[in-house]
Regions:
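Short polybasic/polar patches that bind polyanions
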Residues: 95, 112, 135
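Acetyl-CoA-dependent GNAT
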Residues: 3-86, 91-93, 104-106, 110, ...
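Active-site acidic-Proline motif in GNAT/NAT acetyltransferases
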Residues: 91-93, 97, 125
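Conserved G/P- and acidic residue-centered "switch" motifs that form tight phosphate/ATP-binding loops
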Residues: 98, 115
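Loop/helix-junction capping segments adjacent to catalytic residues or to phosphate/diphosphate-binding pockets
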Residues: 11, 97, 128
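C-terminal "cap" of GNAT-fold acetyltransferases
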Residues: 117-168
């Protein structure tokens, strides 16, 4: 498995996003439907965010995730520089291998490199495996920070200082 930089305007990345949105849309009808909102590629341009791709051992793209920096709102954020985790998805055939945790680690490292002091994300209550992953990796429930029509849960993770050697 390899995690690499991606470009949401490229065909392979667009296919991953179609797979992601298709998976979500299929799972959400019972929960009131799912609204597809394709990402603006400029959100992941390297200065304002990144988009990462997970390739399997054969080099086939099987997952993705992104980080986008959010506009500062001192009243809301209390001085935190927030980065939002977006579009985390792995093909169901790859699940259970720990790759989602590795992808989240890589996204966190990218957010730190962009100057973030806090990660936030939103998800849906039907995605229980995702909720367990987020809890296991240090995310805690928080108040809604956006008006995403697909979200029913919001999480945050402070990015405290790294200890000696770059670890916590």
């Amino acid at each position: 498995m390899r995690i690499r930089s991606g470009d949401v305007s490229q065909p392979a990345e667009q296919q991953l996003l179609r797979d992601y949105f298709g998976y979500r849309a299929a799972a959400f009808p019972q929960a009131g439907g799912y609204t597809v909102s394709l990402p603006d590629p400029s959100q992941f341009d390297g200065a304002r965010g990144v988009f990462l791709v997970v390739d399997d051992d054969s080099g086939v793209p099987v997952g993705c995730g992104g980080i986008r920096m959010l506009a500062l709102d001192p009243a809301r954020d209390g001085g935190a520089v927030r980065a939002e985790v977006k579009h985390v998805w792995l093909d169901p055939s790859t699940r259970g291998r720990g790759w989602a945790g590795e992808l989240l680690d890589a996204l966190e490292q990218s957010a730190r490199a962009l100057g973030a002091t806090e990660l936030v994300l939103d998800t849906h209550h039907t995605l229980e495996a995702a909720a367990r992953l987020y809890a296991r990796t240090g995310f805690v429930p928080t108040e809604p920070y956006n008006d995403n029509p697909n979200a029913t849960r919001w999480y945050r993770k402070p990015l405290g200082d790294l200890g000696p050697g770059g670890s916590r």
